[in-house]
């Protein structure tokens, strides 16, 4: 897929996955592992993909190269769903250098038994990789959401490569009828939400850049109305509610607390309130967390278990 004249999408879609990171339900729409190639006088590949799709990714890369050879593999984020293809790439393209933060190279030793000492290029905040006609300026983004993370900015086409920032659940070959925000919100608060102050820090850096395109490592490439996405991330990372409404989260064994919650929800709705109710024993925990941050009020209705409150209960708990 052509993003700009010289930047191509070479990522893959995963429709076999049921739980992303072993806990987030993506069984309906799958997951995308994004990767990109920048075709300057020199060629840089931005990130790899999950281990089950390395061959497909390398095939996509070969097609985009059209007979040329890559000069660099740029690693923005070392999580295995983005770094599993490193060894195969380095073996296939023995002349290529690998570009990453020092923290990423430390992880490579643990992952692959080497940090490619003869071929590595360590970069940090403010460093520039000149590709001839294009360049990547690196932006430190620690703890968004891993400590080694870098963003990079391509100034010619005004593209931000944002690692897991601005990511979204869902494969890219499926159109999400709910739009970007719903699954991007669930993704953000499940995976990145703990690190709001670090997201705020990188957003301040991004404010100084003329960004026309955002290329994340999950979800669609963002090309229009970028102010909306940046403003939304500012809201999420500053822990401000998006909407007026009430999230009620509960766990009930024998149904007594459930009945009380249903009565409360009905009474609130009768007063014109927007109410979102989650049974934490049965409903998707990530969706409950999503709505807890989305709305401006939260009710936690708890059973008791051995004299303590218990929202997540064991099988012999009683309310």
Where do the protein language model's features map onto the residues?
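Metallo-beta-lactamase
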Residues: 2-5, 50, 100-216, 220-224
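Conserved beta-strand hairpin/beta-sheet module of binuclear metal-dependent hydrolase folds
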Residues: 2-65, 151-154, 158-162, 257
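Active-site metal-binding motif and surrounding structural segment of the metallo-beta-lactamase
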Residues: 41, 52-99
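Active-site neighborhood of phospho(di)ester-bond hydrolases with catalytic His/Asp-centered motifs
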Residues: 46-48, 71-78, 99-101, 160-163, ...
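Short acidic loop-to-helix transition motifs that present clustered carboxylates
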Residues: 79-81, 105, 280-286
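N-terminal beta1-alpha1-beta2 submodule of the flavodoxin-like/Rossmannoid cofactor-binding fold
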Residues: 225-312
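Conserved small/polar residues in nucleotide/adenosyl-binding loops
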Residues: 313-319
């Amino acid at each position: 897929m052509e993003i700009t004249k010289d930047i191509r999408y070479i990522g893959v879609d995963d429709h076999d996955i049921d739980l992303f990171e072993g806990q987030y339900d993506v069984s309906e729409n799958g997951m995308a592992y994004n990767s990109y190639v920048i075709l300057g006088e020199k060629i840089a590949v931005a990130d790899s993909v999950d281990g089950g799709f390395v061959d497909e990714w390398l095939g996509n890369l070969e097609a985009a190269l059209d007979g040329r050879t890559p000069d660099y593999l740029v690693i923005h984020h070392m999580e295995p769903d983005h770094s599993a293809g490193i060894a195969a790439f380095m073996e296939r393209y023995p002349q290529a250098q690998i570009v990453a933060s020092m923290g990423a190279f430390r992880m490579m030793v643990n992952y692959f038994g080497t940090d490619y000492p003869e071929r590595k290029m360590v970069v940090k905040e403010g460093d520039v990789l000149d590709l001839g006609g294009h360049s990547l300026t690196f932006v430190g983004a620690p703890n968004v959401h891993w400590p080694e993370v870098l963003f990079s900015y391509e100034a010619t086409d005004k593209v931000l490569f944002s690692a897991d920032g601005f990511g979204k659940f869902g494969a890219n070959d499926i159109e999400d009828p709910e739009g970007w925000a719903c699954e991007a919100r669930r993704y953000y608060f499940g995976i990145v939400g703990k690190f709001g102050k670090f997201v705020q820090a990188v957003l301040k850096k991004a404010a100084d850049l003329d960004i026309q395109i955002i290329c994340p490592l999950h979800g669609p490439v963002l090309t229009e109305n970028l102010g909306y996405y940046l403003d939304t991330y500012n809201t999420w990372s500053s822990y401000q509610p998006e909407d007026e409404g009430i999230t009620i989260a509960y766990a009930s064994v024998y149904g007594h607390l459930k009945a009380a919650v249903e009565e409360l929800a009905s009474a609130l709705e009768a007063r014109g309130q927007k109410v979102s109710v989650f049974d934490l024993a049965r409903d998707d925990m990530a969706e409950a967390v999503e709505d807890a941050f989305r709305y401006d009020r939260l009710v936690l209705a708890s059973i008791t278990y051995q004299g303590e409150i218990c929202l997540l209960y064991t099988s012999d708990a009683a309310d």
